[in-house]
Amino acid sequence: MSQVRSDKPFTLAGRTYQSRLLVGTGKYKDMDETRDAIAASGAEIVTVAVRRTNIGQNPGEPNLLDVISPEQYTILPNTAGCYDAAEAVRTCRLARELLDGHKLVKLEVLADQKTLFPNVIETIKAAEILVKDGFDVMVYTSDDPIIARQLAEIGCIAVMPLAGLIGSGLGICNPYNLRIILEEAKVPVLVDAGVGTASDATIAMELGCEAVLLNSAIAHAQDPILMARAMKHAVEAGRLAYLAGRMPKKLYASASSPLDGLIK
């Protein structure tokens, strides 16, 4: 019997996860759809935009944590909507206070509202402060391998290069840069942003990414629950394909049946 190549665990901040799909909570039509889509995705880590979502900072308003329980999911507060380092640091500290000392955060510092590209200068500033302040920082960044390396050297526990513009659904726009980042990686690399459908998630995993984080691809689908299920299987299939190792590409045909013993 052939040997099945074993997989290493997906571990972040000392905790191991079965699912390599991380999902967001924005853009759903209501809390019920949010809950059902996340459940269908099989995700164990759920990211929340602290500046846009109530997780306790607005008493009297619906609280997302009432439907996405911290007892069931790892809550990953993010700094979406922040445009400078100081703003991002304040948001992370607020999240830590609201979540009883929670240290795991997703840092994103945006450059402008049109592209939502990361401002890498402000991102590096914020990362340095947060790491020194004891946070476990997962960081949204460009697909520049040098910036990704610097963020890892600062002490970020994961780097999350964009595959395409946030919310664009363009897919994996520059797989070659991602491959360079992956070759040099000393920390987990997760694709963040740009995934539009299941095949995009599979490609990211086939490249060797540890995991995929997405939101719009599910929330904006015609059937979010069904797309959440598709993404779950896509990530699993991509990981298995990566472990299996794809066949080499060839310019010309190669017969799959042996030539020996042909009937003459």
From Swiss-Prot:
E.C. code: 2.8.1.10
GO CC annotation terms, alphabetical: cytoplasm
GO molecular function: thiazole synthase activity
Pfam families, A to Z: ThiG (PF05690)
Main location: cytoplasm
Keyword Cytoplasm part of the UniProt annotation: yes
Places the protein is found: Cytoplasm
Reaction equations catalysed: [ThiS sulfur-carrier protein]-C-terminal-Gly-aminoethanethioate + 2-iminoacetate + 1-deoxy-D-xylulose 5-phosphate = [ThiS sulfur-carrier protein]-C-terminal Gly-Gly + 2-[(2R,5Z)-2-carboxy-4-methylthiazol-5(2H)-ylidene]ethyl phosphate + 2 H2O + H(+)
Main enzyme class: transferase
Keywords from the named record: Cytoplasm, Schiff base, Thiamine biosynthesis, Transferase
Family to which this protein belongs: Belongs to the ThiG family.
Protein name: Thiazole synthase
